[in-house]
Design a protein with these regions (language model features):
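Short amphipathic beta-strand starts and helix->beta connectors
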Residues: 44-51, 115-116, 176
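Oligomerization/assembly interface segments of phage tail-like spikes and tubes
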Residues: 47-75, 124-137, 262-263
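Solvent-exposed loop and beta-edge segments used for protein-protein assembly and interaction
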Residues: 56-60, 87-89, 122-126, 182-188, ...
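Long, hydrophobic/aromatic-enriched structural stretches that serve as scaffold segments
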Residues: 60-110
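Short beta-strand and beta-hairpin "edge-sheet" elements
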Residues: 92-141
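Intrinsically disordered, low-complexity segments enriched in serine, threonine, and glycine
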Residues: 145-288
Length: 288
């Protein structure tokens, strides 16, 4: 598969290839740059060296050089206008990239325009340079990855007091764990959807190395919680009502799951049924 790259503006649903020979332009260079590093450094007062507590990345510069030439289906002087939809700094277009190797993932990063030049050059051509800043420096796999852990069902036997016709609840079901695996370069902090019925739910990773614990609050059947382990938020159902106080903070160790290895995810709860489950979702994160 040849390299592919394109811009997409969600606000206008406009997609534009970075290279389109039939239209009359080619991307001669796409530089994804490297994120700035947010230095947290202090000089040691009475000795050589520094105290370096640097951990995080800043934004990422992205540049692309595009050359327009005569003879395509679009007049050469109209081609710079094809890119202006992505150069409004109030817009947040997406840059999509697929590299040329077997199994290459589609990567996406949200960018913001920072500069645009398009000088007229002799012989007849236009050499454009588009510059962007990516506030979030991580290239994300476009495919949403998921894993599910089932709490299992514990109810079994006859229902009493006896009524006719006799009814039997579903038999017990063993818990089923899920597996989280990222092929990216950076750790995963998944988004969790916890489906009831469940009381005092607990989601464990790697045999309790990391734990997201809830208080004794009850998630009713048909309800769910959305827990973002990266931003540390918790909302109920789709209305966005915050239930952050349902997090048992004293027993929670937020997951930061290293890439390239399997991580187990399991769920326990009081009085679960066959539909009690936790679904984890994430996008693999890449530096380059």
């Amino acid at each position: 598969m040849a390299r592919q790259a394109w811009l997409y503006n969600p606000a206008t649903a406009n997609k534009l290839l970075l290279s389109d020979p039939d239209t009359g332009y080619l991307c001669t260079q796409l530089d994804l740059g490297f994120p700035t590093v947010r230095d947290v450094v202090n000089n040691k007062p009475d000795q050589h060296g520094t105290d370096d507590r640097t951990k995080y990345l800043g934004n990422r510069p992205v540049t692309m050089n595009v050359t327009a030439y005569p003879g395509g289906s679009t007049p050469m002087d109209e081609i710079p206008g094809l890119f202006t939809d992505f150069m409004d700094p109030s817009m947040r277009p997406e840059l999509h990239v697929i590299e040329d190797f077997p199994g290459a993932p589609e990567l996406v990063i949200v960018v913001r325009a920072s500069a645009y030049t398009g000088p007229l050059v002799y012989p007849a051509r236009i050499d454009m340079q588009l510059s962007f800043i990516a506030p979030d420096p991580v290239l994300l796999g476009a495919t949403l990855q998921t894993a599910t852990a089932w709490a299992g069902a514990t109810v079994q036997g006859r229902v009493y007091p006896r009524a006719y016709p006799w009814t039997y609840p579903p038999g017990s079901q063993a818990p089923v764990s899920g597996t989280i695996h990222s092929n990216g370069d950076l750790p995963v902090q998944p988004l969790l959807k916890v489906y009831g019925p469940a009381t005092g739910a607990k989601i464990s990773f790697d045999n309790n190395t990391y734990v997201v614990a809830l208080t004794s609050s009850t998630i009713n059947a048909g309800d769910f919680l959305t827990i973002d382990t990266k931003t540390k938020t918790c909302v109920r159902n789709s209305d966005g009502a915050s239930v952050l106080n349902w997090i048992d903070w004293s027993n929670t160790i937020w997951p930061v799951l290293a890439p390239g290895v399997d991580h187990s995810m399991s769920m326990t709860a009081i009085s679960p049924t066959g539909v009690t489950q936790t679904q984890a979702s994430w996008q693999d994160g890449y530096l380059a």
